[in-house]
């Protein structure tokens, strides 16, 4: 059952080959048997089965939503009524939200059944899921390796078939990089396409929720439910709803040749994504994927994104600045961790934050406070915002000669747990290919396209596909065509 896609699972439910309750029980057993991966931080079988029973009742009455009875795991950055919502932090270890995030509410309204909350880097700050207050997550493909971050629990859960789908968030690559490391498909939509209401904030001008699943087709189904305007989110874009599945299985050009379904598609290859720092085994997997696209009829076009190397310093000015502001609310007064002993109010603030936040979160708060301080705001923050606009302009210039941009999602495959913990800069450099997409607010996704070599032969490689604003449906079409021609996305870790 766990090898089936969302479409196949829904067909099984409609044909009464299984019930939503039986499906939920199946996945709950798998989650329990895979505790060692540490992919989940909160599972409540009673809550899950109650939702599954409601889905079965709706299916029986013919009143079911489009995703009725299908299980999903939620990244623990989305507040969820009835479940703890921790953001991977001791600061919120016992926080119970009185409401659902819009993403959770929309998927629930479509009939999905929540399996639990997945582990993550604390407040979504990290690239390895080692920054969680609840311990690191292991990569199902190689348990010595990280699953990526910050949505590492979600990527591991989908890869290990503990859930057929999961939600994630992407601030600088936190859907795409873990999807790459764990061999699953994940998409970060255009900024503002998916509501941030109820998503615990890291960097408000960058955070964006999105789906993670086995395939592009599954992600399209999920995005149909997740995307849309939300008046409760001031950054939500008012735009007509669309069907993200509408191009799947169709030729790129109307009336095109089914034997060359992507004839007419122009794929931009930035020179900056294939230079120094890209591991040979990753380059080989990406090159092979691009050859597959050529056999499908696509044309490869050289493009340039000259400010790519500036995306890391720009991101690590803007994101920490916004984080320092967003996280100032956690002071031990209204909610969150409060120190047990303190002398006065100021001491309570200091001790509560010192005890509640982990090292990486503290580091970014300090950096953010510094760049926003008097005398440095103009030199750092305003300058970073100017370069951010130039980065976005570079993409628009590139899109004049191509329809999508492709390259690696990460310069390497997943590294060993603990390998980069003492050198945060090396961890930051791992996001070189994803940060600029987030800074520009563009949609981007990662699809499995191979594995590393030698000692890394069990560690997946992800191909990043970048589209122009609101081009998600076309990107999903491009990814789906690749997945119809290859089987990387259906391969499973040993023992699954």
UniProtKB/Swiss-Prot annotation:
What reaction gets catalysed by this protein? L-glutamyl-tRNA(Gln) + L-glutamine + ATP + H2O = L-glutaminyl-tRNA(Gln) + L-glutamate + ADP + phosphate + H(+)
Q: Name one Pfam family in it.
A: Amidase
The answer to whether keyword Transmembrane helix applies is no
Q: Where does the record place the catalytic residues?
A: 75 (charge relay system), 150 (charge relay system), 174 (acyl-ester intermediate)
Source species taxonomy = Bacteria, Pseudomonadati, Pseudomonadota, Betaproteobacteria, Burkholderiales
Q: What are the UniProt keywords, alphabetically? A: ATP-binding, Ligase, Nucleotide-binding, Protein biosynthesis
**Gene Ontology cellular component?**
glutamyl-tRNA(Gln) amidotransferase complex
Species of the source: Burkholderia thailandensis (strain ATCC 700388 / DSM 13276 / CCUG 48851 / CIP 106301 / E264)
Q: Which family does it belong to?
A: Belongs to the amidase family. GatA subfamily.
Signal peptide as annotated in the record: none
Name-wise, this protein is: Glutamyl-tRNA(Gln) amidotransferase subunit A
Role summary: Allows the formation of correctly charged Gln-tRNA(Gln) through the transamidation of misacylated Glu-tRNA(Gln) in organisms which lack glutaminyl-tRNA synthetase. The reaction takes place in the presence of glutamine and ATP through an activated gamma-phospho-Glu-tRNA(Gln).
């Amino acid at each position: 059952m766990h090898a089936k896609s969302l479409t196949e699972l829904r067909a099984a439910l409609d044909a009464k080959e299984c019930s939503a309750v039986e499906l939920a029980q199946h996945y709950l057993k798998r989650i329990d048997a895979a505790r060692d991966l540490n992919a989940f931080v909160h599972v409540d079988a009673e809550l899950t089965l109650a939702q599954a029973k409601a889905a079965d009742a709706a299916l029986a009455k013919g009143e079911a939503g489009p995703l009725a009875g299908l299980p999903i795991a939620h990244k623990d950055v989305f507040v969820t009524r009835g479940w703890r919502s921790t953001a991977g932090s001791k600061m919120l270890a016992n926080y119970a939200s009185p409401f659902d995030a819009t993403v959770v509410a929309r998927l629930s309204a479509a009939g999905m059944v929540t399996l639990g909350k997945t582990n993550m880097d604390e407040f979504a700050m990290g690239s390895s899921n080692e920054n969680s207050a609840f311990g690191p997550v292991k990569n199902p493909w190689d348990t010595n390796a990280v699953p990526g971050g910050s949505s590492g629990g979600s990527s591991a859960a989908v890869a290990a078939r503990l859930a057929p789908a999961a939600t994630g968030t992407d601030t600088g690559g936190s859907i795409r990089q873990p999807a790459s490391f764990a061999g699953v498909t994940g998409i970060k939509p255009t900024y503002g396409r998916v509501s941030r209401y109820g998503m615990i904030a890291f960097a408000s001008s960058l955070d964006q929720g999105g789906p993670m699943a086995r395939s592009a087709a599954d992600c399209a189904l999920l995005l149909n439910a997740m995307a849309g305007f939300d008046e409760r989110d001031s950054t939500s874009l008012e735009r007509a709803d669309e069907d993200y599945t509408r191009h799947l299985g169709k030729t790129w050009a109307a009336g095109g040749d089914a034997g060359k379904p992507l004839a007419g598609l122009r794929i931009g290859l930035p020179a900056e994504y294939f230079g120094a720092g890209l591991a040979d085994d990753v380059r080989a997997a990406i090159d092979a994927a691009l050859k597959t696209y050529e056999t499908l009829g696509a044309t490869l076009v050289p493009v340039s994104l000259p400010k790519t190397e500036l995306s890391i310093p720009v991101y690590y000015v803007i994101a920490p600045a916004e984080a320092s502001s967003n996280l100032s609310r956690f002071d031990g007064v209204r909610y969150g961790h409060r120190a047990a002993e303190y002398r006065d109010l100021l001491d309570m603030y200091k001790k509560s934050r010192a005890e509640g936040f982990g090292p990486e979160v503290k580091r970014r708060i300090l950096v953010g406070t510094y760049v926003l301080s008097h005398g440095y705001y103009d030199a750092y923050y305003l300058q970073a915002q100017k370069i951010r606009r130039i980065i976005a302009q570079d993409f628009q210039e590139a899109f004049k000669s191509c329809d999508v941009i492709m390259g690696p999602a990460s310069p390497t495959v997943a590294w060993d747990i603990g390998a980069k913990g003492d050198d945060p800069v090396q961890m930051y450099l791992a996001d070189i290919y994803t940060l600029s997409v987030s800074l520009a607010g563009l949609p981007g996704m990662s699809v499995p396209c191979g594995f590393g070599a030698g000692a890394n032969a069990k560690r997946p490689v992800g191909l990043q596909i970048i589209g122009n604003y609101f081009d998600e449906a076309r990107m999903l079409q491009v990814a789906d065509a690749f997945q119809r021609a290859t089987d990387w996305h259906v391969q499973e870790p040993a023992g699954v």
